[in-house]
From Swiss-Prot:
Signal is among the record's keywords: yes
Keyword terms of this UniProt record: Extracellular matrix, Glycoprotein, Secreted, Signal
Reported function: May be involved in conversion of asexual males and females to the sexual pathway.
Major subcellular location class: secreted
Sites where a glycan is attached: N49, N96, N118, N378, N381, N403, N476
InterPro entries from the UniProt entry: Pherophorin
Identification of the protein by name: Perphorin-1
Signal peptide: 1-18
Length: 512
């Protein structure tokens, strides 16, 4: 009997652990969506006209002429979801809602997010039909109990507050019709009536402002479809974190604030930089918050420059958030968010008609370039930049391109103006598993104006291509930004099938 009980306990425990490990989105709003920029927010303090009724006021900031992107300029509001406690999800009609004094078209509903933890709950208000002309719209909810006395009647009972926030703090996500966008607002219940003034206190020493621990989170999130998911490397983490830590110290110490130094953590695809500091007694955080907000755009550009994302971030979202120690949504004395979505490039290359879609064939190139010093025998100092090939599952294994079993040749996008033609000293390649060193070839260009470098005569099968190298040896008096026509440290290569009808195109970038 004891053995059966132990066995049942082990099975239940394993199931619970498996469930916990399979949660796709552990934090509100428990789905993948774009949180900023957005013209929509809610007033930070809820209005309460009577017991059990709470009203949320929408604020719409008209998009600036320079704003871009659907979420920043065109999104509507179809539904609003509140992060609530599981215990409030009871049988019966315990929540009623009005929009601008009229009952909502669809009644409020509790739900369990399909991709969130089993214990998570949201309260949904849908078919709201709000937009850029809805500034001041008011959504009011009335909380009650069912006939068994069950239900949450205050915001303190209803809302699941963010980490570190007091009870009654509510997180609300404003979803558009697609839904792609979900700006998040945090609101608090109205303050209670002030107590009668106390008698004059005895003179006491001015207390020291408690320390503020602020963290900067840089998060890279994959967006399918995806051939090569990004994996954060120690070099990228350290390079980005060092710059953020240096900026934090410079900003904080400019206010004559005690600064304890930064701690750096890299976990998964999240870079986390935290620091603690204290303002002098009575000093506001206003100026410090403004400087932190201004720094967000620069910190975002460390990973995703405004000139274009590196190739290894294609189909990824990069977000920089300022919050408390815990997770990016934790509340602290400072806050802010900046985000961008990196899309694959679309160069005017190759100059022939063929299928360029990545994974059209089984032959692919990784999105990272390697570099090393060029041959010492050259008359000029040089650097070797190499693509690394990999064999992948083709998109359509039974199609013309998917059936390709041989890599005939490769072509690289290069700047063929006369001054740049002379900057490439050689092309080189090496099959996977080959015992011989790189084989060097004189550069072979296409017709003038085609900007095409050719690496012919490969004829590799899958075993030779999986891990093979194709390289350019460039003089050090040029750089990839100029030679590869991209304005950044990114180059393009396509890989041809024997019939030249299939030529999947790939970008690769240097890493810090």
């Amino acid at each position: 009997m004891m053995r059966k009980a132990l066995l049942a306990l082990c099975v239940a425990t394993a199931f619970a652990v498996a469930q916990a490990q399979n949660v796709a989105y552990p934090n509100f709003p428990y789905c993948q969506c774009i949180k900023s920029p957005s013209p929509y927010s809610l007033e930070p303090v809820v209005k309460s006209n009577r017991t059990g009724q709470y009203c949320f006021t929408l604020r719409v900031t008209k998009p600036s002429p320079s704003a871009t992107g659907y979420c920043a300029t065109k999104a509507d509001i179809k539904k609003i979801e509140i992060n609530v406690n599981q215990v409030c999800d009871v049988f019966g009609n315990v929540v009623n809602a009005t929009l601008n004094g009229v009952p909502t078209k669809v009644g409020p509903a509790f739900d369990t997010p399909p991709d969130g933890p089993n214990t998570s709950r949201i309260l949904r208000f849908t078919q709201l039909n709000l937009g850029l002309d809805s500034d001041g719209a008011m959504l009011c909810i009335t909380l009650g109990q069912n006939d068994k006395g069950k239900g949450c009647t205050t915001l303190e009972d209803l809302c699941a507050p963010p980490a570190g926030a007091p009870k009654g703090t509510c997180s609300l996500a404003l979803f558009d019709s697609k839904p792609d966008c979900c700006p998040i607002s945090r609101v608090s219940p109205p303050a209670p009536p002030p107590p009668p003034p106390p008698p004059p206190p005895e003179p006491v020493a001015v207390p020291i402002t408690p320390p503020c621990k602020t963290c900067v989170y840089a998060t890279i999130t994959a967006l399918p479809p995806l051939l090569f998911p990004f994996q954060l490397t120690p070099s990228i983490c350290q390079s980005v974190a060092d710059k953020i830590a240096g900026d934090l110290e410079m900003i904080v110490t400019s206010y004559s604030i005690g600064y304890s130094g930064a701690t750096i953590t890299c976990s998964g695809n999240v870079i986390k930089v935290c620091a603690s500091f204290s303002l002098p007694p009575g000093a506001p955080y206003t100026g410090l918050q403004a400087d932190i907000s201004n720094a967000l755009t620069f910190w975002l550009s460390l990973l995703a420059p405004s000139t274009g994302c590196p190739a290894y971030f294609a189909n990824h979202q990069v977000t920089v958030t300022v919050g408390g120690d815990g997770d990016p949504n934790s509340v602290t004395c400072l806050e802010g968010t900046a985000t961008t979505t990196c899309k694959p490039g679309n160069p005017d290359f190759p100059k022939c008609e063929c299928e360029t879609k990545p994974a059209a064939t089984r032959f692919a190139a990784l999105p990272t370039l390697t570099q090393e010093p060029g041959r010492p025998s050259n008359r000029t100092n040089s650097t070797l930049y190499c693509f690394t090939l990999q064999v992948v599952a083709p998109l359509n294994p039974n199609g013309l391109c998917g059936n390709t079993t041989t890599l005939l040749k490769a072509e690289l996008w290069g700047n063929d103006i006369p001054t740049q033609r002379r900057k490439i000293l050689a092309l080189a390649f090496k099959a996977a598993g080959a015992s011989s060193p790189l084989r060097y070839l004189s550069p072979s260009w296409g017709s003038a104006g085609e900007q095409t470098l050719k690496v012919s005569g490969l004829n590799w099968d899958a075993s030779q291509a999986d891990g093979a190298k194709i390289c350019m040896e460039l003089s050090n008096d040029t750089n990839l930004k100029t030679f590869c026509n991209t304005g950044q440290d990114t180059c393009w290569i396509n890989l041809f099938s024997p019939d030249k009808q299939c030529c999947p195109l790939f970008a690769a970038s240097l890493t810090p």
